[in-house]
Curated annotation (Swiss-Prot):
Residues 65-210 form the SCP domain. Keywords: Glycoprotein, Host endosome, Host mitochondrion, Secreted, Signal. Belongs to the CRISP family. InterPro entries: CAP_dom, CAP_sf, CRISP-related, P14a_insect, V5_allergen-like. Glycans are attached at residues 146, 209. SUPFAM superfamilies: PR-1-like. This is Venom allergen-1. CDD domains: CAP_euk (cd05380). Disruption phenotype: (Microbial infection) RNAi-mediated knockdown results in reduced enhancement of dengue and Zika virus infections in human dendritic cells and macrophages after the treatment with salivary gland extracts. Lower viremia and better survival in mice bitten by mosquitoes transmitting Zika virus. No significant effects on Zika virus load in the mosquito salivary glands. Induction: (Microbial infection) Infection with dengue virus or Zika virus does not affect expression. The keyword Signal applies. Saliva (at protein level). Female salivary gland. No or low-level expression in female hemolymph, midgut, Malpighian tubule system and ovary. No or low-level expression in male tissues.
Length: 255
């Protein structure tokens, strides 16, 4: 039987729980409607047959966080030719960011939403990935880990000078997923994943939202001895990252 896999990635740069904000509040968004404003709760027509959410249980959350933080720590410690990061926080899970990600995921359309901000995070970022395959027995955990690694692998094409100033424009292979992953003003993340079918083809679509996005002409992270500016100490599990208690301001330096 013929087997094939197609994977696509996309990243964003800036730019229905009752316990969450009014997402139709125009003060949340500068660039268009919020993805969760008056959004349908059912799956979209693009979701093919048998669409369902992958359960973001403790195992899946930990897998995504562990993979992200392992790779962030590599950059924080100066691997792959990048400068060390003075204050790279450990990413922790945020249920609201994950909740908002579900509104994009349930459309099954591989495209960024225009706005995914929260009251706390006014510059939320986003990474997307989708895969289509037939003849394989991939599981959600396999795909989530693979997506994250592929995002990170963009470091091979990312000029080191971008660390100090994210460019207005970039030509060449994608680098935005990688820069989103290692942004030192991102300290929270939340993801949603959908599994569905189109005939014999099986698809997984992953949406991860982050507390901060790539800001044009601003640093991706601050150079310095690894962890030297952490205010709560370093994470013993992920050397070079600040402890999980480290909270940073997910804001533009321009205010």
């Amino acid at each position: 039987m013929a087997s094939h896999v197609i994977v696509k990635f996309i990243t964003a740069a800036i730019l229905i729980g009752s316990c969450y904000a009014n997402y139709c509040d125009q003060s949340l968004c500068r660039r268009g409607p919020h993805v969760a404003c008056n959004a349908p709760t059912q799956f979209g027509s693009a979701c093919g047959q048998e669409p369902k959410f992958v359960k973001m249980d403790a195992r899946m959350k930990n897998l995504l966080l562990k993979k992200h933080n392992e790779l962030r720590a590599e950059i924080a410690c100066g691997k792959h030719g990048f400068p060390q990061a003075a204050r790279m926080p450990t990413l922790v899970w945020d249920d609201e960011l994950a909740h908002i990600a579900s509104f994009n995921a349930r459309k099954c359309i591989f495209a960024h939403d225009k706005c995914r901000n929260t009251r706390e995070f006014k510059f939320a970022g986003q990474n997307l990935a989708i895969t289509a395959f037939a003849g394989y027995n991939f599981q959600a955990a396999d795909r989530a880990e693979n997506f994250t690694q592929e995002w990170f692998n963009e470091h091979k094409d990312c000029p080191k000078s971008y660390v100090d100033s994210y460019p207005m424009s970039h030509s060449g292979p994608q680098i935005g997923h990688f820069t989103q992953m290692v942004n030192d003003r991102a300290w929270k993340m939340g993801c949603s994943m959908v599994h569905y079918k189109n005939g014999r083809v099986i698809k997984y679509y992953l949406v991860c939202n982050y507390s901060m996005t790539n800001m044009i002409e601003e640093p991706i992270y601050t150079r310095g001895s690894a962890g030297s500016k952490c205010q709560t100490g370093q994470n013993p599990q992920y050397r070079g990252l600040c402890s999980p208690r480290e909270k940073v301001r997910s804001e533009s330096y321009r205010g």
